[in-house]
Structures are given as C-alpha cells and as structure tokens.
Amino acid sequence: MDFHAISQRFIDMMRSKNSQNASQPPETYPFYHEVRQMSQHPWMYEDPELQDYALSILPLDKLFQDASELEKEGDGSWGYQDYVIQALLKWFKREFFVWVNQPPCEKCGGETHMTGNGPPNEEEKWNGVRNVELYQCNVCGHNQRFPRYNRIRALLDSRKGRCGEWANCFTFLCRALGSRARWIWNAEDHVWTEVYSNKQQRWVHVDSGEESFDEPLIYEQGWGKKMSYCLGFGIDSVRDVSHRYIRHPENGLPRDRCPESVLQQALHEINIEFRSRLTDSERKALEEEDKREKDELDGYMRPVSQATPTNTDLPARQTGNVEWKEKRGEAGK
C-alpha cells in the first residue's frame, strides 16, 4: 500500500470515529469528566489582582518597544499585539523562567539526583502542588524538595519548572497583557499555549519552553512526537485542536478514551456554559470564529500530499536532558 493510500485510510478512520455514537451516557466515561475538569484551568488566569501583580513584574517598556521594532521590520501579516506576544516569548524564555532538569543543591550549589517523590506540605497544597520531587546533593548529601507548583502566584515568584509550569505561567502572562489565550493539553504529557491573532483571525501556536511561535508541526516533525489528543481550553473557547498538530497518519496514536461523540458533546456543553454570560453579539462573533476554525482544522484532513508538506527544518526539542527526551519520545527523528 503506497503512502497516499495509507494517508487516506487514516483520514477515513478519523472520519469514522467522528461519526461514532456513544452507546452509554457521556457521564459514564471518565474522560468526559476529565475534560470538564480541565476546562476550569484557564479561569485561574482571570484574577484581576494577580494580573496587576504580573504587570508590575513585566518589563512593559521593553516589551512594547521590542514589539514596535518587530512591527516596523515585519511585512504587515501580523498585528501589534502579535508582536507583543513574540517579545514576551523571547523575554520569558531567555530572561524570566528557568528550566529545571535536576535542581542544583540549595546548600552548596552542587549537582543533585532524584531519590523519589513525597507528599506536599500544607503550604505547598495551598499553592496547587500535587507532587513533590525529592533530591539529594551528590557533593554534600543535602536533601531537598522540588515542589511542582500549579498556582500562578507561586510560579511568578519561583520562576522555574518544566513544561507544565512554563505553559501555565506563560499563558497567564498572555492574558495579563490582554490577549485571548488557550491552555493546550496534550494527552502524551505536554502542554503549551495558543493565542488568538486578531490580525490573522486565527489561533496561533506558542510554546514558551521552545521559544516557538506559529510552528504547530514542531512536535510531530521536529520532536518526532506521536500524539492522540490535543485540547484547547480558554474562557470563551474550548476545542479539540488535534488536527492542527497531528497531520501525518504515522504520528497519530489511538483516540480511545471515549467515543468521539462524547468528547464533542463535552466540549459543546462547556462552550455553551462559558458563553452564557456573554451578549448576543459576542456569542455570534464567537460562533463565526468557530466556523472559521472548523474549516481550518477540517482542511488538515485532506490527503497529506495536498494539506501538509513535511518541514525538515523544524528543530528537535531544546528543553530537557537527552535521557528525559528519549523516554518521552521527543528526541527528534
């Protein structure tokens, strides 16, 4: 069977899944409840006091100046707010947040190794910590904790972590700067951001850990990552955006957590609930946006040779050590 036939078979399979009906009520599927729970995540970004605190930290003059320079150098395809996000992305990656493989010893600065995991203490629980990694210094033997923070205020102060902390804090900062933003969850243990471009009238991929802007194929073509679900969560728009990131049949993993109709029903219900507080004109504008995005995502369902050429210039993953990336299937092809 040639590659075109394989591609068409994959498309037919996905269309068949999309038309699949659930034989049980949606509430009987754990994934239905998981999706609804994840939809609450972006609401933590809407705290006005927290946004004010973020604005007091951000180098606004520098970001706006850098955005103006990018706009002058650009070809007009992006708007000023898009350039603000690009400036934020550069600053966040290079100056603000720190990637942690193993934390250095807090006592002597030596290298450490992981000894296990432990429960969070009361203060850590309050800061959204569910897991604490335990490390021991290779030099002085000092034992220390590395709590995986989820609460935004704690992240703004600690300024370190891995992809979860990076995406969480960066997505929040996009909201603090006035952009519409989505927190993107991938079932294969990665998260990133999408920001809506008013200029281009579409949602744009942004990965703060990789300093990647509008490169949605970086995962499957750069990292060599295989994926199943990619779901986008915002305060006025939730959507299955998997087709934006999974374009080639060999990179698609089984979508078997629930029937497709159950997932679509969950997303539909969430959108209705989130938009119920909006005006009629605001809801109508979002419905038009939904149609444009559906057309975009459906376009990626065409045979690969027509829809998505392979880009061999996309980089392999930058963050994380080699062993960690290989274990996650993200070390590149």
UniProtKB/Swiss-Prot annotation:
A GO MF term: peptide-N4-(N-acetyl-beta-glucosaminyl)asparagine amidase activity
Species name? Schizosaccharomyces pombe (strain 972 / ATCC 24843) (Fission yeast)
Chain intervals with Polar residues compositional bias: 305-321
- Record note on cofactor: Binds 1 zinc ion per subunit.
Q: Which family does it belong to?
A: Belongs to the transglutaminase-like superfamily. PNGase family.
Q: Which cofactor does it need?
A: Zn(2+)
| Its EC number(s) | 3.5.1.52
Q: Which SMART domains match?
A: TGc
Localisation per UniProt entry: Cytoplasm; Nucleus
Q: What class of enzyme is it?
A: hydrolase
Active site, renumbered: C163, H190, D207
Taxonomy, superkingdom: Eukaryota
Q: Which Gene3D superfamilies match?
A: 2.20.25.10, 3.10.620.30
Q: Which UniProt keywords apply?
A: Cytoplasm, Hydrolase, Metal-binding, Nucleus, Zinc
Detail which positions bind substrate. E210
The gene it comes from is: png1
Q: Where is the sequence biased in composition, kind Basic and acidic residues?
A: 281-299, 323-333
Q: What is this protein called?
A: Peptide-N(4)-(N-acetyl-beta-glucosaminyl)asparagine amidase
Region annotation (Disordered) ranges: 281-333
GO annotation (BP), single: protein quality control for misfolded or incompletely synthesized proteins
* Principal localisation: cytoplasm
Q: Where does Zn(2+) bind?
A: C105, C108, C137, C140
Q: What does this protein do?
A: Specifically deglycosylates the denatured form of N-linked glycoproteins in the cytoplasm and assists their proteasome-mediated degradation. Cleaves the beta-aspartyl-glucosamine (GlcNAc) of the glycan and the amide side chain of Asn, converting Asn to Asp. Prefers proteins containing high-mannose over those bearing complex type oligosaccharides. Can recognize misfolded proteins in the endoplasmic reticulum that are exported to the cytosol to be destroyed and deglycosylate them, while it has no activity toward native proteins.
